[in-house]
Amino acid sequence: RQCDWSSDVCSSDLDVAVMPEAIERLAKWTGSHDVIQGSRYDYDGGPFYWQYDFIVPLGIPNPIAPAAFGRPGYRVMDTLCFEGGLFRRNIVEQIGLPDPRFFIYWDDTMYGYRASKVTNPIVVPDVILRRTREIGNWDIAGVRQLNSTSDMNRYHIMRNRGYMARYFMSFGDYRPLMFGFGTLLTAAKEVIRLVMVDREHAKTGLVQIAKGWWDSRKLLHDPDWKPMPPLK
């Protein structure tokens, strides 16, 4: 879902509920920042850690980025989550719309990456969302958790790295060896997810991981691919 008012656009998703004070909580940041990511509560009411730091050369989120917001009260980020993202309309005009070819997964990450080329997106501690459904997960030492996902997601997690690489190429950020290592790490993470959280889908999940990885190579070498154009 999307809603817009004045010169700002906000985005949300279907498995989160917007807090009544969400707009007011984000409004105080709009005077000095063009892209703002609010925080959220997990399904159980506890804080939800979101990986705001994207390691561009590897093409993976940083799982150990500090959760504290520090003296400024916010963290600069180079990614985005469509659940609770707020961005000024002139940013959309400069970078274009989100790329629908991703279908699912990495689309919001890459939209935040594109936005970071024209402004400094931030994530703030103000809670504006609450998750509305419980997701099976593996708790990692009480610090991070690895959530359950579907085979369709597994396929697109791997396939869409082809699109990701193309955007990195268009901005001069593509490093083949490091990105390839990031793809290997991504595949390893998905295999671990299968073993620890989604074991009943191990056979079909491995097939989708391999298929998505194979198809990403086709996208990487597609001669007709072009990035999403700016709106103005």
What are these regions (language model features)?
Residues 85, 91-96, 101-127:
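A short, conserved alpha-helix in the catalytic core of glycosyltransferases
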Residues 17-53:
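Conserved donor NDP-sugar-binding/catalytic core segment of glycosyltransferases
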Residues 124-145:
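Active-site donor/metal-binding and catalytic loop motifs
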Residues 39, 55-78:
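Short, flexible, basic/aromatic active-site loop/helix in glycosyltransferases
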Residues 2-3, 67-87, 145:
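A recurrent flexible, glycine/aromatic-enriched loop bordering the glycosyltransferase active site
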Residues 1-9:
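Single conserved hydrophobic/aromatic residue that forms the stacking wall/gate
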Residues 15-17, 102:
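Acidic metal-phosphate-binding loop of nucleotide-sugar-dependent transferases
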Residues 169-232:
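Non-catalytic, C-terminal membrane-associated alpha-helical segments of glycosyltransferases
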